[in-house]
């Protein structure tokens, strides 16, 4: 019986009779079962923490009146975005750790790449919008309610999603218009553009340039918005006479600046580096960091030193405790 080909072997043999790949196989770090079980448990714990942490921020932001301000609305959208971003990648990855059949359909791969690109790009724009929000709140606090009214922050959030969907659509259509007539094995835990281009049998030079310029433009624009916003914030801090006022500003901006540095630092390391330093394993590790690990870290970063969020969570817990006692 051991000499009979497995289902996966039969599928690979059938590929020779077709001109186009209709399914992909996701190849992760290792084929050793014990290691895969460990990775399954590790990333399951990370995913559960991501869900609990981010939804634990969304609920008080929605339910607590004291958090009904643009700054916390942006944070709530970011937390919801992180849940979506992680959910696009993690469940399929967890299944593949334990499953013998690690395949994903052509349409499923395109959908996963489109959603991951959409949520990842939206996070870039949203972090820039949050920097502008903090600039308005600190540099001109008396006009904050006017400068950051629903007529301003709702279009900012909407535009972030619309621009990201457009960006993701262009890259997804361009990538899956290529021919995949050779190997169908993707050395990655999810469908991402670089490993897909690596297995295409078409000329990918134009698409690689398109991808580089699009990602580079988004990074430059969003980072510039962050830098300009924090430049004005720094000027406002230097004008402050109160040490308590400076402490509040650092507390308000420190978490966001940390989140921006980690996220954009990872993206820049991923895409703005010499091609000679590219390896599929490094690509996989960095991709896991910004799609799975960062969404887990964000609730810690944004709530650890935020007294308003911690007080809102306490009020929510006390309120639920009293309701259960009635």
From Swiss-Prot:
MF (Gene Ontology): G protein-coupled receptor activity; odorant binding; olfactory receptor activity
**Glycosylated residues, chain numbering:** 17, 101
What do the Gene Ontology cellular component annotations say?
Answer: plasma membrane
Tell me, in a sentence or two, what this protein's role is: Odorant receptor.
Q: Quote the InterPro entries the UniProt record gives.
A: GPCR_Rhodpsn, GPCR_Rhodpsn_7TM, Olfact_rcpt
Where are the Extracellular topological domains? 1-37, 88-111, 173-208, 271-283
User: Which chain positions lie within coiled-coil regions?
Assistant: none
Q: Which family does it belong to?
A: Belongs to the G-protein coupled receptor 1 family.
Q: Name one GO biological process term.
A: G protein-coupled receptor signaling pathway
Record's protein name: Olfactory receptor 5T1
Transmembrane feature ranges: 38-58, 67-87, 112-132, 152-172, 209-229, 250-270, 284-304
Q: Identify the Pfam families for this entry.
A: 7tm_4
> Where does this one sit in the cell?
Cell membrane
- For this UniProt record, give its keywords in alphabetical order, as a comma-separated list: Cell membrane, G-protein coupled receptor, Glycoprotein, Membrane, Olfaction, Receptor, Sensory transduction, Transducer, Transmembrane, Transmembrane helix
Organism listed in the record: Homo sapiens
Cytoplasmic side residue ranges read: 59-66, 133-151, 230-249, 305-326
Report the membrane topology from the UniProt record. Multi-pass membrane protein
Asked whether the keyword Protease is assigned, the reply is no
